[in-house]
Design a protein with these regions (language model features):
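N-terminal nicking endonuclease/strand-transfer module with a His-rich metal-binding environment
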Residues: 1-310
């Protein structure tokens, strides 16, 4: 394997942390957790290919960004420890850079190829039976039918149908982060999945802060990347745009139309790179909704700049 394939874990201050050390640290940091409570949370940071290209896919820059993002993670807790806000030193985490991704069964390309894959598998099985003399059939015709199905399938890489397990092309570096449920002192339980938004509640006669501000974490992490690497983020790459696309597609498209000429050109190029032609203007009204839904689906699948998931 190349050195890039031999990435170890790192945290805020240390590097080259071995997997067994990570397991030991996480397993040993679970004081007073109930049996059904998770020992840790998983976060994935997935810079887009545009962002990776901008930083030349540099692992050092990715590590630097993760460390900055984890500062934002800590400050997004609406909690206090010893009367002070939570800081990154209170968070026990371990991160690892991965450089490859494979297609999964729930990826758009795999799902939309599935009907073709099924027919091809059936025909290949039939072809083998004909070749073994188990059934009568025209092998040349079956082979032609297989080639046609491959040709007609919507998603391919170098002529091959995209299927689960196939490696994705292009820059695919992403970071997996394991964050202990308990703080670094093994005293306080910290959950980014808290159902409570940032608020205060009275407990045992005292007002206690609680909650985790997800929007703040996403937006500030995005700003940190842009600030650190002088990245000029396009509207369609922004967290606020992705959120608007999910909640109010009509407003999202209005915002796209109102972009400056240069930014709009780049935005539409990014959208086209997700694999869908933009809907033409002046579509009959009954087709507009369909086009918007299809475009929305493809943008969500294809544009995940600095996406951070749990």
């Amino acid at each position: 394997k190349s050195p890039m394939d031999k990435e170890y874990f790192f945290n805020q201050y240390d590097e080259n942390i071995r997997p067994y050390e990570v397991i030991k640290e996480i397993d040993g940091n679970t004081a007073k957790l109930k049996l059904k409570e998770p020992k840790y949370y998983s976060i994935t940071i997935s810079p887009s290919q545009y962002e990776l290209k901008h930083i030349h896919n540099n692992p050092e820059k990715l590590r630097a960004f993760v460390r900055e993002a984890m500062k934002e993670y800590a400050s997004s807790f609406n909690r206090e420890i010893g009367g002070r806000p939570i800081i990154v030193n209170d968070i026990k985490y371990f991160a690892k850079i991965e450089h490859e991704r494979t297609f999964k069964s729930n990826d758009v390309a795999v799902r939309e190829n599935k009907p073709y894959s099924k027919q091809i598998a059936h025909l290949k099985n039939e072809l083998r039976k004909v070749e073994r003399g188990e059934i009568l059939g025209n092998t040349r015709q079956i082979e032609n039918d297989i080639r046609k199905l491959i040709r007609d399938a919507p998603y391919k890489i170098r002529g091959q149908l995209i299927e689960p397990g196939m490696k994705k092309e292009g820059l695919q570096s992403h970071i997996h982060i394991i964050v202990s449920r308990k703080d670094a002192s093994n005293t306080y339980s910290l959950s980014p999945g808290s159902k409570y938004i940032a608020s205060e509640v009275e407990m045992h006669g005292k007002w206690v802060k609680r909650g985790f501000e997800r929007d703040r974490f996403f937006q500030n992490s995005e700003k940190a990347f842009d600030r650190m690497f002088q990245y000029n983020r396009n509207y369609v790459e922004s967290y606020s745009a992705r959120k608007m696309l999910s909640k109010d597609p009509k407003q999202y498209f209005l915002s796209l139309r109102n972009l400056g000429i240069h930014e709009k050109k780049i935005a539409f190029k990014m959208i086209r790179n997700t694999g869908l032609q933009l809907p033409v203007l002046h579509l009959p009204q009954n087709k507009v909704g369909f086009a918007v839904k299809q475009l929305k689906k493809m943008i969500e699948a294809g544009i995940k700049s600095s996406s951070i998931g749990y």
